[in-house]
């Protein structure tokens, strides 16, 4: 029998190269949002129990197992001098909880049926920090003006912060925007941008920031003292030039494209 590998991975770190089949697990219950489980991994039984705690999750596992049985049977029947090892990627957001749980359980079931499995957990040693924020704008003479904040450390960007226990990412975006700018914004439906980048001062640590698009009217900017050195309201091109990092510029470009394609009446009708 040729080598068969099941590899867990995190989508934020990229899909695994050379995977013949990829199984997604992002629809399963996520232990990250359970305080006593978030710092554990899918190698822990309590985490696996949580991931497969619903009838839908159990049914999805069974369908994945059945699919792999058929995929492996087809692979074993295939005869060619160019035949390569079979690689199955199993992904979730960060590669620590759901994908690892599914990989462990599928591998155990297949090995119990006499199928040797090589198991790899590609991103288990990586840490993913979760934050959320908003690209905040108002309209002047029909054109958007964007709020650009400069922290006391000098890095210009958008209001954002860590997602607290019990918060949704939208809740965090609203809270952080009000705390850092003094603005109560309306999140426009349909926009969600994700920014992922490594933290240079933390080995094997990445940050994922989910951005929404927040609109406000007739409110003064009140930047948070001691944290925000400057808050500017800029037209698009000036805002783009003010941002130093390409991943942040990319979020602003997405927001501007979204606004350009959105009728003004629809933008004004958005809600929390």
Predicted regions and their residues:
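C-terminal accessory "lid"/substrate-recognition subdomains
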Residues: 1-86, 113, 123-125
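Catalytic cysteine-centered active loop of the rhodanese-like fold, especially the PTP/DSP P-loop
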Residues: 81-108
